Design a protein with these regions (language model features):
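Transmembrane alpha-helix interface/packing and boundary motifs in multi-pass membrane proteins
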Residues: 111-121, 272-274, 286-307
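Re-entrant/interfacial helical elements at transmembrane boundaries that shape
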Residues: 91, 123-137, 165, 300-316
Length: 375
């Protein structure tokens, strides 16, 4: 297992957690229903409004001609992809989170994915929900921050390494396929810089806040400001180091991350095969990875950023534009929109799970109080 320190739940901490409410900005019941309404409105626009735009009606109707066997395989790959995501979550957060089993891991991951898809760019909605649940599970704030960083690093290190290796491989001719500069060298350089920054962050001492306190002293507003400023770099350094420990220990979390991305790409491959020939595997991977950068755009529900980016990337690689459109939209239907439904269900299941935790905790406190009173 990783070298992350085990965080022992604190009973006083759990009392504080009872006062914490579910993140309201992202995940109130009303906003969740409105978000689902937005999804259905967007789907209706895509499937009923988009075909009426001049010039793409013929391309759109190709969806009706998709091979059902390949589409069924895409569905299987979708399930396997999110299975990998659940495994990744489970093995990152299990230490110090005694209440987190596979069922709870499923509820948290699917609900957070739904929150990310509906409400926020870059995964902010899912991160807020996950942090709230982990606090209710008995983890300290620092442990939640550290493990969230580990989770994000392990998720995106596979993404960045893939972009670097495949981008360089295509450009140098090691991998077969066209290699336009802007779709190989530029994203590979971006990935390389991101990896270098992460490794440099790992060099920072994890007790940076304590060192700042000792160097400046604990008095005055300047010392307090410096100590707070040192908290985030120290947490990031600890998170990156713990991620490296997971890799060295060959933790199942790594397999979960690889499975998540690999099966996601497999969904896209099956979507291409449902309507024609898939591009060379390296082009398929690079087009997928470049398109996923659209997740960083602050668009409602993430609509348009990934879709447009992925379609544009494949067209830039020379893939037939009609095939690229139907394949990418089919992929998004499976990997993005379809899981939102079980994610919404998992969200309400998660609320019941957290309520059960509170009841169990309250029962334990009453039992302890009665035992002390009878002693």
């Amino acid at each position: 297992m990783s070298g992350a320190p085990v965080d022992v739940p604190n009973p006083h901490q759990e009392e504080d957690d009872d006062d914490e409410e579910m993140p309201r900005v992202q995940m109130t019941r009303r906003r969740f229903v409105l978000g689902l309404g937005l999804i259905f409105a967007v789907v209706a626009l895509l499937y009923y409004g988009l075909p009426r735009i001049a010039g793409i009606d013929e391309t759109w109707h190709r969806i009706e001609q998709g091979d059902p066997w390949w589409l069924a395989l895409a569905l299987v790959f979708t399930v396997l992809s999110f299975g990998g995501y659940v495994v990744l979550f489970r093995y990152v957060y299990v230490e110090g989170g005694a209440r987190i089993g596979m069922r709870e891991s499923y509820e948290v991951t699917m609900a957070s994915l739904a929150a990310t898809r509906i409400f926020a760019a870059g995964g902010a909605g899912g991160i807020a929900l996950t942090a709230w649940v982990m606090r209710r599970a008995g983890m300290s704030r620092r442990a939640v921050v550290d493990r969230t960083i580990v989770f994000l690093v392990l998720t995106y290190v596979v993404y960045m390494v893939g972009m670097l290796v495949v981008g360089v491989g295509l450009r140098t001719g090691v991998f077969p396929g066209p290699a336009p500069f802007g779709l190989t060298v530029v994203p590979a350089a971006f990935a390389g810089i991101a990896i270098m920054i992460a490794l440099l962050i790992a060099l920072l001492p994890t007790d940076l806040q304590r060192r700042v306190d000792e160097a400046i002293g604990r008095g005055g507003w300047l010392a307090r400001l410096a100590a707070k400023a040192a908290t985030l770099p120290a947490s990031m350094s600890a998170g990156v180091r713990h991620s490296i420990d997971h890799v060295r220990a060959r933790d199942p979390a790594i397999l979960g991350s690889i499975g998540y991305w690999a099966f996601n790409i497999a969904v896209l491959w099956a979507s291409f095969r449902a309507f024609g020939e898939a591009p060379p595997w390296a082009v398929l991977v690079m087009g997928f990875l470049v398109g996923m950068l659209g997740n960083l755009l602050p668009l409602p529900g993430g609509v348009g950023g990934v879709d447009g980016g992925m379609i544009g990337a494949f067209i830039g690689f020379g893939v037939d534009d009609g095939l690229a459109v139907v394949a990418v939209l089919t992929y998004r239907a499976f990997a993005f929109w379809l899981p939102t439904i079980p994610g919404a269900v998992a969200f309400f299941q998660l609320r019941r799970t957290v309520a059960r935790w509170r009841e169990e905790r309250d029962h334990g406190r009453r039992t302890t109080a009665m035992a002390r009173a009878g002693a």
